[in-house]
Curated annotation (Swiss-Prot):
Purpose: Represses a number of genes involved in the response to DNA damage (SOS response), including recA and lexA. Binds to the 16 bp palindromic sequence 5'-CTGTATATATATACAG-3'. In the presence of single-stranded DNA, RecA interacts with LexA causing an autocatalytic cleavage which disrupts the DNA-binding part of LexA, leading to derepression of the SOS regulon and eventually DNA repair.
Species in which this protein is naturally found: Yersinia pestis
InterPro entries, sorted: LexA, LexA-like, LexA/Signal_pep-like_sf, LexA_DNA-bd_dom, LexA_repressor, Peptidase_S24_LexA, Peptidase_S24_S26A/B/C, WH-like_DNA-bd_sf
EC number: 3.4.21.88
Name by which UniProt lists this protein: LexA repressor
GN (gene name): lexA
Amino acid sequence: MKALTTRQQEVYDLVRDHLAQTGMPPTRAEIAQRLGFRSPNAAEEHLKALARKGVIEIVSGASRGIRLLMEEEEGLPLIGRVAAGEPLLAQQHIEGHYKVDPSLFKPGADFLLRVNGMSMRDIGILDGDLLAVHKTQDVRNGQVVVARIDDEVTVKRLKKQGNIVHLLPENSEFQPIVVDLREQSFTIEGLAVGVIRNGDWI
């Protein structure tokens, strides 16, 4: 499979997620609206590029005529090092898949993230662990989240007050990260729902 660009990966992920949630692919207009394209024609061009790369098939004559061809591997995707400016679940970040039942976690896990560092040591999240993550932006203060600040991904406990976000470590050797939402790019990538001790599954 040819590597996808960041934008192509976003379009592919949107089609896949829409299929999983509704049972049907999105229209070009829905893709354009969700991803901020100026017109459905822009969405069509990205779909044609995906078709040329062999990951989807465009069925002519139907507004929702999109069929996925890229086989989804079994298990939860394991995300390793994340490149700057790219979606967390971009294909190039996936190191492999682990046959873990997502329903073991509440809410269910969507992916695994390899933990880097000991900033969350005191609650049992250690360097090299595989953190089970539920993909959502619906999180509350006090929860452990996966967050992206500018182009850096981190795992911390969330505390939000107005335009200021405090990302709190669980290790006294580390300082909190303070984010001013008026000045920095900040995105919640998901909610931590469990830990797999690295080595138990590899």
